[in-house]
């Protein structure tokens, strides 16, 4: 080795040593504390700030076995999932789902809401889905979410209310929890214990309107045989209009003959007597007049023949039902003026409007 070659080798060795020493020293930029960046490549990608959605492997996600929507919910039908799946396949999931950590199986997640998007993603052959992690989530939150999207059937709502009542919660507390009126809760509670014929009509889809079901139950309590016979007619359409006519017919049929009619001011007995008088000829007319003259009394102008208490509930006009015993102190039965629905309500939610003569 010549002197020049030895000098060059020594310089290269020194440069290499200096480079190694420099690599071992902190950069001064704080980057040395990061470690191996390759270890981050396999972690879920979160948005800046750590509060945005992450991309979760679908195989790590489970549906909530206690979610309010049941297997026969229309949104879970094969056609519905295929429809949303086709959209996801073409455009992806635009709105992240919400999940919480599975406390029983660390590393896995349970869906809070977004089961249809989850199923649609699997249908579309996706491997992952954008998701928010929200561990502060309960069944009431799921119900609220689905109520706002109109994705719960009346039966699913009723089943949730039934579970909450079984826990010892009061109807008023449940109403506040899900942002609904007490009347809404009462109407759906009725679905939990329907008479057999009405239950059949509801479960088979002949009637889906909760208000109509409640109207049928009210009529059934008064005239069960007539309501059952009415429902036995499979060609009978069940709507608010037809049920209202049914109730009017049953009420008229079972009305006390001494009830004063609000339109003509006569009792049914007086009306029938007048009709009979007209058929009996002159003698009958005279006898009727004599009987009326003997029993006639001057009406007291300070007394109401029939008092009607007009109120307002949920910004809808209603009236108090004075001849029905309330379920508890502070409650009363009301009847809406627009559709004739009868229901029990907390008097704290009722506004007195007027007292008139019927």
UniProtKB/Swiss-Prot annotation:
One of the protein's GO biological processes: negative regulation of DNA-templated transcription
Positions of the UniProt region annotated as Disordered: 1-79, 256-305
Biased composition (Low complexity): 1-42
Pfam families: KorB, KorB_C, ParBc
Metal-binding in keyword set: no
Gene Ontology cellular component list: chromosome; protein-containing complex
SUPFAM superfamilies in the record: C-terminal domain of transcriptional repressors, KorB DNA-binding domain-like, ParB/Sulfiredoxin
GO molecular function: DNA binding; identical protein binding
Assigned keywords, A-Z: DNA-binding, Plasmid, Repressor, Transcription, Transcription regulation
Start-end of Basic and acidic residues biased regions: 286-305
Biased composition (Acidic residues): 275-285
PANTHER family associated with the record: CHROMOSOME-PARTITIONING PROTEIN PARB-RELATED
Similarity remark: Belongs to the ParB family.
Function of the molecule: In conjunction with KorA, inhibits the transcription of the kilA, trfA and korAB operons. Is also involved in the negative control of the kilB operon.
Protein known as: Transcriptional repressor protein KorB
Gene for this chain: korB
């Amino acid at each position: 080795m010549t002197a020049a070659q030895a000098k060059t080798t020594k310089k290269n060795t020194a440069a290499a040593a200096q480079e190694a020493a420099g690599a071992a020293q902190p950069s001064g930029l704080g980057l040395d504390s990061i470690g191996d960046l390759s270890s981050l490549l396999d972690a879920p990608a979160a948005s800046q700030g750590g509060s945005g959605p992450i991309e979760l492997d679908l195989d790590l996600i489970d549906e909530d076995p206690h979610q309010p929507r049941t297997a026969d919910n229309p949104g879970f039908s094969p056609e519905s999932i295929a429809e949303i799946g086709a959209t996801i396949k073409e455009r992806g999931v635009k709105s992240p789902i919400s999940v919480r950590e599975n406390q029983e199986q660390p590393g896995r997640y349970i869906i809070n809401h977004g089961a249809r998007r989850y199923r649609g993603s699997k249908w579309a052959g996706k491997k992952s889905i954008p998701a928010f992690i929200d561990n502060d989530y309960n069944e009431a939150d799921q119900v609220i979410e689905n109520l706002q999207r109109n994705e719960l059937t009346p039966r699913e709502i009723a089943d949730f209310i039934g579970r909450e009542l079984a826990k010892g919660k009061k109807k008023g507390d449940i109403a506040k929890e899900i942002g609904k009126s007490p009347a809404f809760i009462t109407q759906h509670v009725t679905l939990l214990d329907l008479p057999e014929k009405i239950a059949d009509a509801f479960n088979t889809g002949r009637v889906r309107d909760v208000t109509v079901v409640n109207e049928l139950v009210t009529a059934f309590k008064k005239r069960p045989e007539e309501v059952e016979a009415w429902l036995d007619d499979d060609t009978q359409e069940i709507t608010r209009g037809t049920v209202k006519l049914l109730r009017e017919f049953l009420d008229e049929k079972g009305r006390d003959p001494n009830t004063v009619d609000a339109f003509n001011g006569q009792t049914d007995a007086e009306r029938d007597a007048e009709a009979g008088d007209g058929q009996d000829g002159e003698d009958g007319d005279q006898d009727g007049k004599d009987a009326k003259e003997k029993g006639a009394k001057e009406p007291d102008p300070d007394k109401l023949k029939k008092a009607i208490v007009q109120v307002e509930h949920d910004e809808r006009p209603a009236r108090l039902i004075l001849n029905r015993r309330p379920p508890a102190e502070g409650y009363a039965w009301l009847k809406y003026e627009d559709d004739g629905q009868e229901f029990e309500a907390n008097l704290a939610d009722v506004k007195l409007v007027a007292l008139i003569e019927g």
